[in-house]
């Protein structure tokens, strides 16, 4: 039996034809997808009926790097789900490995991003000679260096940042914790901000908030959004911008510089790889160095 062939694939497709009267073209597409997946698994010492969710996610990352479109991957996953439901129903496997794998979203527009030149212009917009401007510059640097959600950024406390190790501890959706590298540029701005500006903003008031407002309190997301829009106007950026735009730029630029999709998923705090797939219109190469070598400001 060649690595492409597998008796379970034929049995599944025959059952599908008998139960649903599947069109010949769809049936052959499913056959090709499943045979290709089986060959991919065989090359890694894995068996079609003995894999878990991680193997499927790894294969999805491989498909994306090979340039497969979202519609093609959606068809592949549809066939794969049907195959494993069939295996589960017949008692051939104990659990369905596709249950926690999301289908790619079709027709969803790409998130707005910025070019690296636009990001540089935005980062340079705040006047850093006063505490407010230095705070804003540092927030923008951290936002771009780490790809944080705005709620994660404004909620940062002093104890979440470790400048010696160069990482920030982030509590994302569902209180999931992740460590994200800061990079040299962001570390430098944080050191200057903590030395020159944060104390002036607090005015002697005790607080563990990393980026306090002028009242010494945690800044709201809406306030930071207005600050970003102001700096975007100063930088003459024509693209409509929001705090999330820099998160998109973080992901897009990392992938454009050769980052691995699974690493970007981890840095963004996405629970599923498919959420990160929308950025892969520019993904081309594997990551050689996790952050410092590939991030534009690493």
UniProtKB/Swiss-Prot annotation:
Tyr recombinase domain mapped to chain residues: 109-292
Annotated compartments: Cytoplasm
UniProt cross-references to InterPro entries, sorted A to Z: CB, DNA_brk_join_enz, Integrase-like_cat_sf, Integrase_catalytic, Integrase_recombinase_N, Integrase_SAM-like_N, Recomb_XerD, Tyrosine_recombinase_XerC/XerD
Core-binding (CB) domain sequence ranges: 3-88
Main location class: cytoplasm
Coiled-coil segments on the chain, per record: none
GO MF annotations, alphabetized: DNA binding; tyrosine-based site-specific recombinase activity
One of the Pfam families matching this protein, by short name: Phage_integrase
CDD domains: INT_XerDC_C (cd00798)
Top-level division of the source organism's lineage: Bacteria
Gene Ontology annotations of biological process type: cell division; chromosome segregation; DNA recombination; DNA transposition; resolution of DNA recombination intermediates
Keywords of this entry: Cell cycle, Cell division, Chromosome partition, Cytoplasm, DNA integration, DNA recombination, DNA-binding
GO cellular component: cytoplasm; Holliday junction resolvase complex
PROSITE patterns the record matches: CB (PS51900), TYR_RECOMBINASE (PS51898)
Active site: 149, 173, 244, 247, 270, 279
Subunit structure: Forms a cyclic heterotetrameric complex composed of two molecules of XerC and two molecules of XerD.
Family classification: Belongs to the 'phage' integrase family. XerD subfamily.
Protein function: Site-specific tyrosine recombinase, which acts by catalyzing the cutting and rejoining of the recombining DNA molecules. The XerC-XerD complex is essential to convert dimers of the bacterial chromosome into monomers to permit their segregation at cell division. It also contributes to the segregational stability of plasmids.
Name of the molecule in the record: Tyrosine recombinase XerD
Species this protein is from: Pseudomonas aeruginosa (strain ATCC 15692 / DSM 22644 / CIP 104116 / JCM 14847 / LMG 12228 / 1C / PRS 101 / PAO1)
Name of the gene this protein is made from: xerD
């Amino acid at each position: 039996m060649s690595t492409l062939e597998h008796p379970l694939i034929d049995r599944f497709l025959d059952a599908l034809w008998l139960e649903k009267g599947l069109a010949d073209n769809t049936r052959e597409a499913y056959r090709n997808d499943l045979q290709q997946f089986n060959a991919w698994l065989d090359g890694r010492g894995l068996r079609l009926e003995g894999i878990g969710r991680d193997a499927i996610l790894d294969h999805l990352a491989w498909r994306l790097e090979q340039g497969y479109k979202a519609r093609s991957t959606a068809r592949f996953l549809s066939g794969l789900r049907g195959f494993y439901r069939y295996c589960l129903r017949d008692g051939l496997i104990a659990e369905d490995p596709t249950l926690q794998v999301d289908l790619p979203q079709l027709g969803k527009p790409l998130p707005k991003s910025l070019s690296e030149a636009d990001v540089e212009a935005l980062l340079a917009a705040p006047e850093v000679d006063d505490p407010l401007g230095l705070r804003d510059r540092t927030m923008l640097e951290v936002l771009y260096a780490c790809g944080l959600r705005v709620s994660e950024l404004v909620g940062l406390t002093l104890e979440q940042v470790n400048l010696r190790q160069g990482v920030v501890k982030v509590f994302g959706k569902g209180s999931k914790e992740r460590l994200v590298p800061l990079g040299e540029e962001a570390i430098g701005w944080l050191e200057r901000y903590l030395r020159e500006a944060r104390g002036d903003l607090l005015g002697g008031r005790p607080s563990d908030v990393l980026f306090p407002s002028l009242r010494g309190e945690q800044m709201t997301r809406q306030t930071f959004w207005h600050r970003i829009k102001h700096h975007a106007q100063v930088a003459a950026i024509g693209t409509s911008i929001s705090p999330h735009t820099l998160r998109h730029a973080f992901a897009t630029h990392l992938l454009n510089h050769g980052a691995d999709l699974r690493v970007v998923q981890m840095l963004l705090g996405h629970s599923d790889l498919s959420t990160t797939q929308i950025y892969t219109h520019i993904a081309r190469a594997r990551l050689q160095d996790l952050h410092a070598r590939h991030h534009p400001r690493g």
